[in-house]
Curated annotation (Swiss-Prot):
Its cofactor is Mg(2+). GO terms for biological process: apoptotic mitochondrial changes; calcium ion import; calcium ion import into sarcoplasmic reticulum; calcium ion transport; intrinsic apoptotic signaling pathway in response to endoplasmic reticulum stress; maintenance of mitochondrion location; negative regulation of endoplasmic reticulum calcium ion concentration; negative regulation of striated muscle contraction. It comes from Mus musculus. It is found in: Endoplasmic reticulum membrane; Sarcoplasmic reticulum membrane. Belongs to the cation transport ATPase (P-type) (TC 3.A.3) family. Type IIA subfamily. Keywords: ATP-binding, Calcium, Calcium transport, Disulfide bond, Endoplasmic reticulum, Ion transport, Magnesium, Membrane, Metal-binding, Nucleotide-binding, Phosphoprotein, Sarcoplasmic reticulum, Translocase, Transmembrane, Transmembrane helix, Transport. InterPro entries: ATPase_P-typ_cation-transptr_C, ATPase_P-typ_cation-transptr_N, ATPase_P-typ_cyto_dom_N, ATPase_P-typ_P_site, ATPase_P-typ_TM_dom_sf, ATPase_P-typ_transduc_dom_A_sf, HAD-like_sf, HAD_sf. Residues 70-89, 274-295, 778-787, 852-897, 950-964 are lumenal. Inhibited by sarcolipin (SLN) and myoregulin (MRLN). Has also been shown to be reversibly inhibited by phospholamban (PLN) at low calcium concentrations in vitro. Dephosphorylated PLN decreases the apparent affinity of the ATPase for calcium in vitro and this inhibition is regulated by the phosphorylation of PLN. Enhanced by DWORF; DWORF increases activity by displacing sarcolipin (SLN), phospholamban (PLN) and myoregulin (MRLN). Residues 788-808, 932-943 are annotated as: Interaction with PLN. This is Sarcoplasmic/endoplasmic reticulum calcium ATPase 1. The active site is at residue 351. Its EC number is 7.2.2.10. The chain crosses the membrane at residues 49-69, 90-110, 254-273, 296-313, 758-777, 788-808, 829-851, 898-917, 931-949, 965-985.
Length: 994
């Protein structure tokens, strides 16, 4: 049934053809079950494990590697002689890399899929219904409830479907809807129609929503919708429909992979074509086919050389280390790639309650009447410090601390706050904080009494557990609470009937203490309290009181005000009828006004500074709240989202105002606005969509089930540590301390991580460029192989992987939070950088080939061949006069390969030092700023020595131990790369950065 909240109870009953007393007949139940289906949320159709595994191989680079592995496997199969074993090493290693990558990928995907399952925990197991086949109420499984069923709910029950309330069987019905609306205060329900068909969930005061909890009272209602049609069901559908986008880094790496694969394909084809003439060379035994296969192997080597196999592992490691650093700052990251996305966040949409504020109501102002002279009335106004439930703070008058006990009016005000109250404070020893027990508003009054300490109780010697209610218990010993007149909507107040305790010999009789909404309570006051006397309440005095309340309720503070009053001579207990709440109004008449307290959910202390940080970093903060607009704007001014006198017409909207705008203007509003009030969860998703249309990277916070679709849609969903499991599973990050400042710290960390990733991605790629140049040069010049695939894999994975990982520990730049967020479209490698890589890569390639050639041409223990013989080695046979007196086997000697590999590794270690900073000289940023990097370079070199000097490794890698003169040559060839990069950095600093 649509818009049940706007229909009268009679209309709802006749729509389903049911009577409130008897319920549906078995026949109707059967028909409704067929029409509407069972009352449950369908299970999520997840991807099977096999589908997830296949998905991991959709990446182009992965496919090229897979192809290379298959080809080298086939080639290894046809290999003859002693090389058979070593030939299988390479395809085996490539496959291992691919499998490891796939496992990590599948594990991450699996985590993301659990969000929808978590919604299940809000489904109630059972429900209580009236049906025509039984006289009394019967308990049935919640999934069997159908629209039209008459359902009974009582305190502690979980609501089994979306229900329109027909009648309330207690004084009040309070419902905790925080999982749906995110607002922590429980809501008082009624049975009248809500005429507005477009009302937001917070305003549907005559509806009970599936999955919410009954906090107090008992009621009977008619089921309006079940299953997927309920509010929580709609949330599930939104979540199921939300596809996760790739993070900016994933998109970058995908683009990069595509470009790389095109380049690789081109180079492979080029190498093949250049050498078609050599296919028949005698070295291949004159067989064209074997010649083709030989160059095929070189093409495979090229593919292996060009792909940075170590990159996925290094990125994962760097992100994982980043998540550990963030966890120390209370930000728990659930999906690794989002660590980097945080770095380009340009908009943070934050909930107000609990994130920007403490979610601990606290009284910050109060007043009592000072004196009344005819129509002139003066007030004593006080402010109270402390913004949490901790009983620590002082009472100030004109900014100077005062003793509250000196003012008779404050003693009575404290008495009302302590007695007209069902809540208390509790010190949680495990968390080390004071927490509320009961309603937030009432706990604020309990805390106020503790701060006022009107009877000067000795509290310094008490433990924190005893301190929690010390001053309240003193007051509760003086007066005994007999009974409570519950809050009701018509009078907007509640009261307690108290009698003096036997022990106190004060000459006071019974009293009634009242607290409630100011207009309601003050209308029933005939007197005001001045000191210990009471004075008649005249029109001008009432106007004065109401004007202060109005001033407090608007403007910068927007406090929630409560009036406190006493009935000095209440009726006798015996004369009062306590089971008829309609009579409560008469008992709360003839009151004496005592004072007013103003409270708010105060902003967290650190938030103002964090918002300033965001402003410096070019990040816009948008506050989104279910609260009303006045309160929202006031908090925005307090924390610096708006300045004190800023005009907010185009920058703050309610959900309704936003909906009423045409679509184009809604989109425009999202570009300007910094505050949305009275919003529904669906608005959050809409806002994210509009922001994404401007290419903004949005971080969205949320804690309720209602926030899950928006959390899933935003690039960075941020759930609260105290939030629901659904919100946490739909988000990328969880704030352990629910604090907005933690988000800003995480953004800073994200920026630092991205900068470091840029450095090591560039480092790894320049290494690959060098390897490609090396293989291309040997093939183009017709030289013997300088590097074989298994050596390339070793370099890409191990020797380069360690320094690359260590580059993830580079310290962040000092001005990292003074720059605007980087555009997600900014390429990883810009034009100048591309030139730099090409220059460095070109040097690396030339140096490795040069080192191998040096051994052939000039080394003391080398064959001293001529350059012509070296470039035409393919034609070497015993019968060829050009190669007279030369053993052709020499062209397959391991020494030149060892020289080439050692030069490659040494240059890479120098390059790692170059990568400490993008443009800073090594003189300005010496190597020891990153001690991890020095350690990893030592480790990499040790591993290189391992494969040179420890059997059987040299055989597998086809290497030979080097002597001292050869190592000297390696260093001479390698070290100039540092000078080359310093020169390029110098040009960048002085001529390119304007």
């Amino acid at each position: 049934m649509e818009a049940a909240h706007s229909k009268s109870t009679e209309e709802c009953l006749s729509y389903f053809g049911v009577s409130e007393t008897t319920g549906l007949t078995p026949d109707q139940v059967k028909r409704h079950l067929e029409k509407y289906g069972p009352n449950e949320l369908p299970a999520e159709e997840g991807k099977s494990l096999w589908e997830l595994v296949v998905e991991q191989f959709e990446d182009l680079l992965v496919r090229i590697l897979l192809l290379a592995a298959c080809i080298s496997f086939v080639l290894a199969w046809f290999e003859e002689g002693e090389e058979t074993v070593t030939a299988f090493v390479e395809p085996f290693v490539i496959l291992l890399i691919l499998i490891a990558n796939a496992i990590v990928g599948v594990w991450q995907e699996r985590n993301a899929e659990n969000a929808i399952e978590a919604l299940k925990e809000y489904e109630p197991e059972m429900g209580k219904v009236y049906r025509a086949d039984r006289k009394s109420v019967q308990r049935i499984k919640a999934r069997d409830i159908v629209p039209g069923d008459i359902v009974e709910v009582a305190v502690g029950d979980k609501v089994p479907a979306d229900i329109r309330i027909l009648s309330i069987k207690s004084t009040t019905l309070r419902v905790d809807q925080s999982i749906l609306t995110g607002e922590s205060v429980s809501v008082i329900k009624h049975t009248d129609p809500v005429p507005d068909p477009r009302a937001v969930n917070q305003d549907k005061k005559n509806m009970l929503f599936s999955g919410t909890n009954i906090a107090a009272g008992k009621a009977v209602g008619i089921v309006a919708t079940t299953g997927v049609s309920t509010e929580i069901g709609k949330i599930r559908d939104q979540m199921a429909a939300t596809e996760q986008d790739k993070t900016p880094l994933q998109q970058k790496l995908d683009e990069f992979g595509e470009q790389l694969s095109k380049v690789i394909s081109l180079i492979c084809v080029a190498v093949w074509l250049i050498n078609i003439g050599h296919f028949n060379d005698p070295v291949h035994g004159g067989s064209w086919f074997r010649g083709a296969i030989y160059y095929f192997k070189i093409a495979v080597a090229l593919a292996v050389a060009a792909i940075p196999e170590g990159l996925p592992a290094v990125i994962t490691t760097c992100l994982a280390l980043g998540t550990r650093r963030m966890a120390k700052k209370n930000a728990i990251v659930r999906s690794l790639p989002s660590v980097e996305t945080l770095g380009c966040t340009s908009v943070i949409c934050s909930d107000k309650t609990g994130t920007l504020t403490t979610n601990q109501m606290s009284v910050c102002k109060m007043f009592i009447i000072d004196k009344v002279d005819g129509d002139v009335c003066s007030l004593n106004e006080f402010s109270i410090t402390g913004s949490t439930y901790a009983p620590e703070g002082e009472v100030l008058k004109n900014d100077k601390p005062v003793r509250a006990g000196q003012y008779d009016g404050l003693v009575e005000l404290a008495t009302i706050c302590a007695l007209c109250n069902d809540s208390s404070l509790d010190f949680n020893e495990t968390k080390g904080v004071y927490e509320k027990v009961g309603e937030a508003t009432e706990t604020a009054l309990t805390t106020l009494v503790e701060k006022m300490n009107v009877f000067n109780t000795e509290v310094r010697s008490l433990s924190k557990v005893e301190r929690a209610n010390a001053c309240n218990s003193v007051i509760r010993q003086l007066m005994k609470k007999e009974f409570t007149l519950e809050f009701s909507r018509d009078r907007k107040s509640m009261s307690v009937y108290c009698s003096p305790a036997k022990s106190s010999r004060a000459a006071v009789g019974n009293k009634m203490f009242v607290k409630g909404a100011p207009e309601g309570v003050i209308d029933r006051c005939n007197y005001v309290r001045v000191g210990t006397t009471r004075v008649p309440l005249t029109g001008p005095v009432k106007e004065k009181i109401m004007s202060v309340i109005k001033e407090w309720g608007t403007g910068r503070d927007t406090l929630r005000c409560l009036a406190l009053a006493t009935r000095d001579t209440p009726p006798k207990r015996e004369e009062m009828v306590l089971d008829d709440s309609a009579k409560f109004m008469e008992y709360e008449m003839d009151l004496t006004f005592v004072g007013v307290v103003g409270m708010l959910d105060p902003p967290r202390k650190e938030v103002t500074g964090s918002i300033q940080l965001c402003r410096d970093a070019g990040i816009r903060v948008i506050m989104i709240t279910g609260d009303n607009k006045g309160t929202a704007i006031a908090i925005c001014r307090r924390i610096g989202i708006f300045s004190e006198n800023e005009e907010v017409t185009d920058r703050a909207y309610t959900g309704r105002e936003f909906d009423d705008l045409p679509l184009a203007e809604q989109r425009e509003a999202c570009r300007r606005a910094c505050c949305f009030a009275r919003v529904e969860p669906s608005h959050k998703s809409k806002i994210v969509e509009y922001l994404q249309s401007y290419d903004e990277i949005t971080a969205m916070t949320g804690d309720g089930v209602n926030d899950a679709p928006a959390l899933k849609k935003a690039e960075i969903g941020i759930a609260m540590g105290s939030g629901t499991a659904v919100a946490k599973t739909a988000s990328e990050m969880v704030l352990a301390d629910d604090n907005f400042s933690t988000i800003v710290a995480a953004v800073e960390e994200g920026r630092a991580i991205y900068n470091n990733m840029k450095q090591f991605i560039r480092y790894l790629i320049s290494s690959n460029v060098g390897e490609v140049v090396c293989i291309f040069l040997t093939a183009a010049l017709g030289l013997p192989e300088a590097l074989i695939p298994v050596q390339l894999l070793w370099v890409n994975l191990v020797t380069d992987g360690l320094p690359a990982t260590a580059l993830g520990f580079n310290p962040p730049d000092l001005d990292i939070m003074d720059r605007p967020p980087r555009s997600p479209k900014e390429p990883l490698i810009s034009g100048w950088l591309f030139f730099r890589y090409m220059a460095i890569g070109g040097y690396v390639g030339a140096a490795t080939v040069g080192a191998a050639a040096w051994w052939f041409l000039y080394a003391e223990d080398g064959p001293h061949v001529s350059y012509h013989q070296l470039t035409h080695f393919m034609q070497c046979t015993e019968h060829n006069p050009e190669f007279d007196g030369l053993d052709c086997e020499v062209f397959e000697a391991p020494e030149p390969m060892t020289m080439a590999l050692s030069v490659l590794v040494t240059i890479e270690m120098c390059n790692a030092l170059n990568s400490l900073s993008e443009n800073q000289s090594l003189l300005r940023m010496p190597p020891w700023v990153n001690i991890w990097l020095l350690g990893s370079i030592c480790l990499s070199m040790s591993l290189h020595f391992l494969i040179l000097y420890v059997d059987p490794l040299p055989m597998i890698f086809k290497l030979r131990a080097l002597d001292f003169t050869q190592w000297l040559m390696v260093l001479k060839i390698s070290l100039p790369v540092i000078g080359l990069d310093e020169l390029l950095k110098f040009i960048a600093r002085n001529y390119l950065e304007g």
